[in-house]
Each structure stands twice: as structure tokens, then as C-alpha cells.
């Protein structure tokens, strides 16, 4: 029986003849009992369903070689750790840190385990450490209305204060009328029994208040950083010993107080200078003949002496006012921004200059014939008397000529000759 020829078969099933040449088809001989050779199912892999040829070779992954230097170092450190463990007394080791005795731990794992134990020990101690609320007195601020500033300031630099006192100014003095921005309302948490017991013992005065810090460390920070300058006052933090402070008073900062005193003295001098100016002006208005004793009785000499004292005082003030006025006039003469530039002085309206004539007007004024017809000779209106009649006294030759032309020829309709006609037309 002739063999069966199959086309479109995989490459590994193509027929290879006795001459060693591969044919483009497969041949199935009767000896195979009518069954083809077993085929391996090729999975369609790769991008876009491309098939992977089984003939493609893949580079084998080389075996991982261990560095002999690292292996020797690990052996040395593991032996040293084993000797240390044998010499140390047997202690209870937590279950996660136990290892099987037949396995020798590496140096890196031992170092990591030791570092983890060392770092976890203080963290566990710190986590289980109980915080003790501590009471502190804040004293020295301006008044009870400014208590919020002291509490807010010390809470920021030291730590949380358990009391729910306000940390912001009153609502009426705020720009935004809201209670939600106050930390006393936004960052509150439940109090512990110890904190609640100390918070309930509230004590305060006009210039001091007792507060409770959540821990002794926060109280130590507040006392160590005391005093603090708050709104021009020195606010002290002291441990509460069961009694209020000896003095309930504000403690202003000396530097701020000195600056305020200097400022008040400056304002007093300015008021005195203003009073001297007004006093000198009053005396000048009274005149040189005005007698200061005219309004006083002459029964006693005390009044006269008082008048003399007031007169001498006024003279002294006048002298100081004159000196101050000279300095003020000298200061007002130059600009403040550019001291070398003098200020422009505004003259009164009466001293304003009239507009100067132009060059053409000056030439026309020198010519007699043309000068007759300018505004100075003709004027801006018909010259009339108070009764409305034509004023022959003040009228110039031009207006006299115009009156005759209007009277004889009626050139202007009688407007120049009769003023009543002008009023009727108006």
C-alpha cells in the first residue's frame, strides 16, 4: 500500500528521504498502523497571538556562584556569635526570635535581629509610659480679657493644655465671627480621669490662671521657657503648689514701659507747645493795654502774686514757643523726602499776577491809531449812569460817535441811545 502524503504539516514532521533531503510534505507509511506521529500542542504565545517556534533556543540562566569572601566572613561571624551565645546566661527569648538548633544563622540576619530588639525596647517603654498631668500657674498678663493670648502662646511652645479656655480673642473683636477656628473647640479629646480631676479644680484671677498640661515634660518646657513676652507683658509659668500667687498684678515689660513713658513725654511736650501757641495768641488778641488784674479783685496780694506767676510762666512759654516756632518754620521750609529742596509756597489770591499782554498786543499799544480800537479804549460795554442813561462824562470818543450815529441814523436800533430798550429785549 503506498504511503499517505500530507501537506501543510509542522516542520518537525516533514519527510526526510534516504538521501538526507527534507521534503515539503509528510509521508505516513502503512507500518504506522494508520496513526500519525504524536504531535506536541504549541501554545499561541507572545504579542498579538504570534506562535513561538519550538526550535528557538533560549540562553540558560547561569548558576549563582557564591562569593568565597562573603562566605568566609559569614562563617567567622557566625562562629563568634555562637561562642557569645554559649558564654552568655540562658535567658528567655521571645518566640519570633527562636531558631532551629540545626540551622546556623547568618551575620546579616543576626545584626538585623539585634537592631530590631534594641529599637523596639525603648519604643515599647515609651508607648507604655504613663503621662502625668501637671498643674502650672500663668501669671503677669494684662487682664482677664487677654488671658487667651497667654494660654495660646504657652500651648504652642510647651504642649497641650487640658482646659477648654479660649485660645482666640473675643468674637466681637475678631475679623471673622466664628467659633470653629478656636483650637479649644477644634482639637479637643476625651480627658483621662486624672486630667479631669485637675481640670475641675479651676482657679484664676485678674492677672493669673491655673492650667493643666497633659504631661510633666510639657510643664517642664513651659517653666523652663518662662518668662515670655506676650502683648507687652512678661508672663511667668510656675508650678502650682496648691495656693494662688502672692500678688495678682500685671508685669509689663520694662523696655516697652520705657518706650511708652518716652512717648507720653513727647505727647506732653507737644500739648504744652500747642497750649503756649494758643496762650500767646490770646494775649496778642487782648492787646498790650489789657491788664491781667482787671478781672481779679484787689483785696488780697495772693491774687496779684498769682498774676505775676502766670505772667512769668506765659513769658517762658512764649520764649519756648518762639524757639519752637522758629524750628518749625525752618523744618517747614524744606521738604521731608528731599531735604535740600524748598517747598512751594501758595500766595493769596489777591497777589495773583494778571495775564501779561502778548507780543502783538504790545506792538498794537504803541501805535496811536490802533490803540483807540482796542479793549482799553472801547471797553466791554456801553458807558451808562446809575439811572441807565448814556454817560457823557466817562464815554470815550468812540462811544460818543456811536451814540450820534444811533441817534441820527438809527444804526444800532436805539440800543446805545436808550437803555430801556435793552431791558425790554432781555
Curated annotation (Swiss-Prot):
Keywords carried by this UniProt record: Membrane, mRNA transport, Nuclear pore complex, Nucleus, Protein transport, Repeat, Translocation, Transport
Any one of the GO BP annotations: mRNA transport
Comp. bias regions, Polar residues: 84-93, 104-113, 270-283, 291-318
Entry GO CC: nuclear membrane; nuclear pore
Membrane topology value: Peripheral membrane protein
Region: Disordered, residue numbers: 36-69, 84-129, 270-329
Location within or outside the cell: Nucleus, Nuclear pore complex; Nucleus membrane
Intervals holding FG repeats: 48-49, 259-260, 412-414
Classification via Gene3D superfamilies: 3.30.70.330
Entry domain remark: Contains FG repeats. FG repeats are interaction sites for karyopherins (importins, exportins) and form probably an affinity gradient, guiding the transport proteins unidirectionally with their cargo through the NPC. FG repeat regions are highly flexible and lack ordered secondary structure. The overall conservation of FG repeats regarding exact sequence, spacing, and repeat unit length is limited. FG repeat types and their physico-chemical environment change across the NPC from the nucleoplasmic to the cytoplasmic side.
Quaternary assembly: Component of the nuclear pore complex (NPC). NPC constitutes the exclusive means of nucleocytoplasmic transport. NPCs allow the passive diffusion of ions and small molecules and the active, nuclear transport receptor-mediated bidirectional transport of macromolecules such as proteins, RNAs, ribonucleoparticles (RNPs), and ribosomal subunits across the nuclear envelope. Due to its 8-fold rotational symmetry, all subunits are present with 8 copies or multiples thereof. Part of a tetrameric NUP192-NUP170-NIC96-NUP53 or NUP188-NUP170-NIC96-NUP53 module.
Function: Functions as a component of the nuclear pore complex (NPC). NPC components, collectively referred to as nucleoporins (NUPs), can play the role of both NPC structural components and of docking or interaction partners for transiently associated nuclear transport factors. Active directional transport is assured by both, a Phe-Gly (FG) repeat affinity gradient for these transport factors across the NPC and a transport cofactor concentration gradient across the nuclear envelope (GSP1 and GSP2 GTPases associated predominantly with GTP in the nucleus, with GDP in the cytoplasm).
Entry protein name: Nucleoporin NUP53
Organism: Chaetomium thermophilum (strain DSM 1495 / CBS 144.50 / IMI 039719) (Thermochaetoides thermophila)
Gene that encodes it: NUP53
Amino acid at each position: 500500500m503506498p504511503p499517505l502524503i500530507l501537506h501543510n504539516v509542522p516542520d518537525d514532521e516533514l519527510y526526510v528521504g534516504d538521501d538526507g533531503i527534507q521534503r515539503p510534505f509528510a509521508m505516513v507509511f502503512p507500518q504506522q498502523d494508520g496513526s500519525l506521529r504524536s504531535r506536541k500542542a504549541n501554545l499561541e504565545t507572545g504579542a498579538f497571538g504570534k506562535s513561538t517556534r519550538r526550535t528557538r533556543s533560549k540562553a540558560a540562566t547561569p548558576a549563582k556562584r557564591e562569593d568565597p569572601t562573603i562566605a568566609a566572613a559569614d562563617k567567622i561571624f557566625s562562629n563568634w556569635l555562637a561562642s557569645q551565645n554559649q558564654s552568655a546566661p540562658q535567658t528567655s527569648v521571645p518566640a519570633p526570635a527562636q531558631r532551629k538548633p540545626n540551622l546556623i544563622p547568618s551575620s546579616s540576619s543576626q545584626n538585623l535581629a539585634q537592631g530590631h530588639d534594641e529599637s523596639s525596647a525603648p519604643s515599647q517603654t515609651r508607648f507604655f509610659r504613663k503621662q502625668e498631668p501637671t498643674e502650672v500657674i500663668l501669671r503677669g498678663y494684662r487682664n482677664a480679657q487677654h488671658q487667651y493670648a497667654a494660654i495660646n502662646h504657652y500651648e504652642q511652645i510647651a504642649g497641650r493644655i487640658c482646659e477648654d479656655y479660649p485660645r482666640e480673642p473675643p468674637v466681637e473683636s475678631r475679623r471673622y465671627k466664628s467659633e470653629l477656628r478656636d483650637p479649644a473647640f477644634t482639637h479637643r479629646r476625651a480627658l483621662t480621669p486624672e486630667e479631669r480631676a485637675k481640670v475641675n479644680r479651676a482657679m484664676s484671677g485678674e492677672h493669673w490662671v491655673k492650667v493643666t498640661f497633659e504631661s510633666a515634660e510639657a510643664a517642664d518646657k513651659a517653666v523652663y521657657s518662662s518668662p515670655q513676652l506676650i502683648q507687652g507683658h512678661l508672663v511667668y509659668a510656675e508650678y502650682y503648689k496648691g495656693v494662688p500667687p502672692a500678688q495678682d498684678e500685671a508685669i509689663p515689660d520694662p523696655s516697652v514701659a520705657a518706650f511708652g513713658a518716652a512717648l507720653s513725654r513727647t505727647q506732653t511736650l507737644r500739648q504744652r507747645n500747642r497750649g503756649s501757641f494758643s496762650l500767646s495768641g490770646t494775649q496778642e488778641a487782648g492787646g498790650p493795654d489789657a491788664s491781667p488784674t482787671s478781672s481779679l479783685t484787689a483785696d488780697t496780694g495772693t491774687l496779684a502774686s498769682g498774676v505775676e506767676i502766670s505772667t512769668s510762666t506765659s513769658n517762658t512759654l512764649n520764649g519756648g514757643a518762639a524757639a519752637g516756632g522758629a524750628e518749625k518754620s525752618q523744618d517747614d521750609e524744606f521738604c521731608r523726602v528731599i531735604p535740600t529742596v524748598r517747598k512751594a509756597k501758595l500766595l493769596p489770591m489777591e497777589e495773583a499776577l494778571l495775564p501779561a499782554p502778548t507780543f502783538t498786543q504790545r506792538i498794537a499799544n504803541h501805535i496811536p491809531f490802533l490803540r483807540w480800537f482796542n479793549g482799553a479804549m472801547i471797553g466791554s460795554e456801553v458807558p451808562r449812569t446809575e439811572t441807565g442813561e448814556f454817560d457823557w462824562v466817562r464815554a470815550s470818543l468812540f462811544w460818543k460817535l456811536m451814540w450820534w450815529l444811533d441817534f441820527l441814523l438809527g444804526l444800532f436800533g436805539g440800543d446805545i441811545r436808550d437803555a430801556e430798550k435793552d431791558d425790554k429785549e432781555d
